Structure formats: structure tokens, C-alpha cells
Amino acid sequence: MVIFSSYFSKQMNRFSTPFVFFFKKLNNTLKKSLQFIMRFHSYHPMFICLLRDSSRNENRKKKVSIGLRTIMRAFSFLMQVATCLIRYSLILTCLVAILLSVLWRIQFAALRMHDLIEEELKMFVLQHNCTLADLWSGKCPSSEDE
């Protein structure tokens, strides 16, 4: 879990987004919760399982929780899934930001083009002394006729 936590920290340091602070806080919270679980396990008699302690007498057995190991495996798996989701959500956020930037530039260019066309139409109508309805119906003389 410590390896995963340091890997998670290194990955988060690679991104310079506003979300980094939040994810660092999340990482610290997860570390503290893991430490709490380990302390709870060492003092709580509810988790009982027998594992051999190879450093001591072979007949002595150490109480360790199968339930805790299962919880820790599930927790580790969920953390890996969360890391993938965070990584891909950051990548997706960057892609969406790029897409929105491109769309905003296209929209800005289209609005400028619309304004230019509108100005040209107004000037054409004023020069030829006709209305927009005349222009659309074809009654207004074109600049090629002159």
C-alpha cells in the first residue's frame, strides 16, 4: 500500500492542474485511514486467524485477520481503480478543455465573420438605395450590373 501511495503521489505531481491539491489531500486522508485500520487491527480481538510466526517458535501462532487481509485487498483494488479513474478523468478534462478552446475560437471567428457580412450587406443596401427584402428577392441591382 505504501508503494501504491508513493506511486500515486508521483503521478499526481506530474499534473499541474487545480485538482492536484484536492487529490493530494485525498491521498493523505487515505494514508491516515490505512494507518487507523492497521492500529485498529492490532488492538482489536475481533479479527482472529492463525498464521505461523516463522521468527519465533513454530508452535506459537500469531492472531491475524483473514477479514482484514480481505478488506485490505479490496481496499488496494479500489485504490487502483480510483487511480485509473483519476488519471483518465484528468486526461479527459484536458481533452475537453482543449476541445472547448478550439470551439470557442471557431465560434469567435464565426461571430466576427457574421459581423463583417452584416456590415457589408448594410453598406451594399445603403449604396444601392434598396431594402434587404429587395436584395433577397433579386430586385436590388448587383454590383456587377453597374
UniProtKB/Swiss-Prot annotation:
GO terms for biological process, alphabetical: meiotic cell cycle
UniProt keyword terms in alphabetical order: Cytoplasm, Meiosis, Membrane, Transmembrane, Transmembrane helix
Cytoplasm as UniProt keyword: yes
Localization terms from the record: Cytoplasm; Membrane
Membrane topology summary: Single-pass membrane protein
A GO cellular component annotation in the UniProt record: cytoplasm
Residue intervals passing through the bilayer: 85-104
The protein's role, per its UniProt record: Has a role in meiosis.
Protein name (record): Meiotically up-regulated gene 96 protein
